[in-house]
Amino acid sequence: MSVMSWRYSALADRHRALGSNLEDWSGMGTTWTYEATSLAQGYEAIRTKAGLMDVSGLKKIHITGPHANALINSTTTRDVRKIYPGKSAYACMLDKRGKFVDDCILYRMGPNSWMVVHGSGAGQEMLQAEAVGRNVSMQFDDDLHDLSLQGPLAVDYLAKHVPGIRDLKYFHHMQTTLFGAPVMISRTGYTGERGYEIFCKYEDAPKVWDTILGEGKSMGIIPCAFTVLDWLRVESYLLFFPYDNSEMYPFENEAPGDTLWELGLDFTVSPGKVGFRGAEEHYRLKGKERFKIFGLLIDGTTAPDGGSDITHNGRKVGVVTCAMHSHLTNRTMAIARLSVDTAVQGTPLKISGKNVETTAIAHTITFDDPKKAKRNAVG
């Protein structure tokens, strides 16, 4: 059903015309589904051709000033000295307990200028709190829209309009023009494919959207709903706060809060980095995992609902957070929160949910392209 949101996409009318009621995500009406294209069609397009998504519900925050680097360095897990202008990095934010509160992409725009893009967690509030007493300017930018063109043909389409796009490396961005509009194109995404995020002004978003879909139709480029990302992220081990977290699946006797060791996100901490919020607790909690994010390879073709129980030898050992069945690979897969002792390749498991009871094995993730060859492809 349609809901009221306090943020508004310039493409809302386009989405409604495609049969979306627009569900609220992070304060913006977002395309959970389209009548015009199914989730299976969107998934197949992005894996085999290309799909275009409106992901403008992501929050964009500009941070500038003499203390901008220090603010980013103290708030996130990345060493900002290694991120030069034109480069970006995936990072996490922790609370003082060393527990995950949000993830983000850090875009370095200049020597003392950044753009932080995050989802529905408390990233903005953390940055605001850490900015107190620092010589920085913070601006929340909802005029800036984010159109994500993802899939193996995305680069072929953009190459017709953007000189040098084939040379843009993974986690790098460029300022350019597209259809006469000023844009920033970033080689990032949330699909496991080679893809690009196109940041443009509110007033230019409809033209960019319409032109890509109009010109790209002959290449198989179609509009894709936001929830297609759930199908893609399961295969590509991409977590989505709070849907894989203890905020959604609480501990019995503890407040919500997962460690990076439990989530498998400890790689986001730059080697040897200290001094960021929650750092001491983060390092202290290594080896004290209460669960592990792990994959499931599931028997049958029915994807269990999120929240389905997982048992091993009659003992509950976890919960499914997100599952999908791929008609391209004929595999049914899931992301799960598993007990540490069962988060081992090949452990036999049973799944009991409202929509299915079946068996599975614990399986390492990533399922699709574990070496990230597609994301790092050149040319």
Residue ranges and their predicted role:
Residues 1-91, 99:
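Acidic, proline/glycine-enriched N-terminal capping motif
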Residues 1-25, 30-34, 107-379:
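Conserved, structured C-terminal
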Residues 42, 57, 67-72, 89, ...:
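Generic hydrophobic, aliphatic-rich segments that mediate packing or membrane embedding
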Residues 54, 103, 197:
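Acidic active-site catalytic centers that drive phospho-/nucleotidyl reactions
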Residues 66-100, 152-181:
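Internal amphipathic helical hairpin motif
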